[in-house]
């Protein structure tokens, strides 16, 4: 799928396209079979907005499992699929909601899994929010590299884009365009209406460049936004 163009003149979240939905068929070097991690591993930190101390454990998952979050601190340990149908809020982060259970600020974890080309994983968390760590997905990448990746028996499923796909949200001044292509390519333009930053562009031509090109990008905030965010009960852990 490419090029994908995201135009975000305001403070919007950059979305990632996963490799398993980005190409019509596996290209050279692209995994044919699904993958998961070799073993469980835990990382701890503080939630950006809630300020809660949280333990996050990555666990191997079976084929066709996808990405799921489990709130082990809640009765029944509810599981929330990392699916767009369960997105409940995108204010300063992405929050998944299912049957009353919530997990927030999931974007860096999911970006790391996509960047590592991991298809199946269960994330157990004992709080309402994923730890922010250094504000990027790099610590999650490095953590997953420590346990390694294992290939599974089932083949990956690839979505074939037959025609241009567009999305526009005038209220958020966001535009997205997906164009059929035999190559993986993502192009992003963002403009925060800042004289200091100006208009910024970024491109990714191979998901395996994610660690070196994208993973270290960190969440930031403008100084003039701090009071407003605090008034909205946010960035308690920032």
Q: Could you describe each region identified by the protein language model?
A:
Residues 2-238:
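Short acidic-hydrophobic catalytic motif
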């Amino acid at each position: 799928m490419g090029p994908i163009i995201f135009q975000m003149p305001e403070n919007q979240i950059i979305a990632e396209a996963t490799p398993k939905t980005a190409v019509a068929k596996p290209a050279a070097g692209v995994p044919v079979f699904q993958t998961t991690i070799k073993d469980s591993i835990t990382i701890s930190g503080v939630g950006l907005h809630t300020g809660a101390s949280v333990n996050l454990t990555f666990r191997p998952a079976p084929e066709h499992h996808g990405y799921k979050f489990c709130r082990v601190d809640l009765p029944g340990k509810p599981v929330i699929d990392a699916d767009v149908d369960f997105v409940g809020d995108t204010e300063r982060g992405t929050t998944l909601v299912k049957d009353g259970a919530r997990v927030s600020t999931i974007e860096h974890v999911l970006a790391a899994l996509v960047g590592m080309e991991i298809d199946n994983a269960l994330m157990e968390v004992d709080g309402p929010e994923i730890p922010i760590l250094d504000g990027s997905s790099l610590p999650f990448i490095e953590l997953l590299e420590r346990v390694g990746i294992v290939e599974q028996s089932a083949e990956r499923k690839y979505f074939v884009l037959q025609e241009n796909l567009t999305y526009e949200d005038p209220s958020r001044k966001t535009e997205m365009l997906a164009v059929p292509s035999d190559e993986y390519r993502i192009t992003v333009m963002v403009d925060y209406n800042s004289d200091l930053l100006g208009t910024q562009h970024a491109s990714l031509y191979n998901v395996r460049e994610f660690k070196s090109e994208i993973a270290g990008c960190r969440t930031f905030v403008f100084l003039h936004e701090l009071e407003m965010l605090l008034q909205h009960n946010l960035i308690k852990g920032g």
